[in-house]
Regions:
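Short catalytic/metal-binding and nucleic-acid-binding patches
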Residues: 1-161
Length: 161
């Protein structure tokens, strides 16, 4: 029997549950810093909003860094695989159309972490929001009402300094 790749082994036994909270992380292909351009990072944020508007997930916190994103969600319907496939596919199409790029934007795999205790939520939300500071990046923080993704949550979009 052929040996399974590390990414395939990660997916064995993966089970997603509606209403569970997950921290999702996806990296750009070859860790290319695509989102140094703030307008391109906004296209990813737009897909987060679409997923919420379509009832797939409630966005609790997120950050888009130059070469990856962290997205803290509560899954509402479908699976994590479906959610991430849609988010990555639609953001790739939008970014490729805007830049004239072709091909893949994201690494095929993504990382997910299911929260097991309520206190983990605060810890992970702080990690997401602090990520630009930890990475020594410049961040623009928007409060509810001043941002197109108008929720009662703080939204952090990061750009390289």
């Amino acid at each position: 029997m052929p040996e399974l790749s590390a990414s395939h082994r990660l997916r064995i036994g993966r089970h997603t549950e509606q209403n569970r909270i997950y921290l999702l992380t996806a990296n750009t292909l070859k860790r290319e810093p695509v989102f140094r351009d703030y307008t391109l990072g906004r296209k990813v944020v737009h897909q987060f909003k679409q997923a919420q508007d379509q009832g797939f997930a409630d966005s609790l916190a997120f950050v888009v860094m130059p070469d990856h994103f962290h997205w803290l969600i509560q899954l509402q319907k479908g699976s994590l695989g479906q959610l991430m496939c849609q988010t990555k596919s639609l953001s790739t199409r939008s970014i490729n159309a805007a830049t004239g790029r072709t091909g893949s934007l994201w690494q095929q795999i993504f990382h997910d972490h299911a929260l097991r205790r309520e206190e983990d939520l605060v810890k992970l939300a702080r990690y997401v929001v602090a990520n630009p500071l930890l990475a020594n990046s410049r961040a623009a923080v928007f409060q509810s009402g001043s941002h197109p993704f108008n929720t009662n949550r703080i939204i952090v979009c990061a750009a390289a300094s």
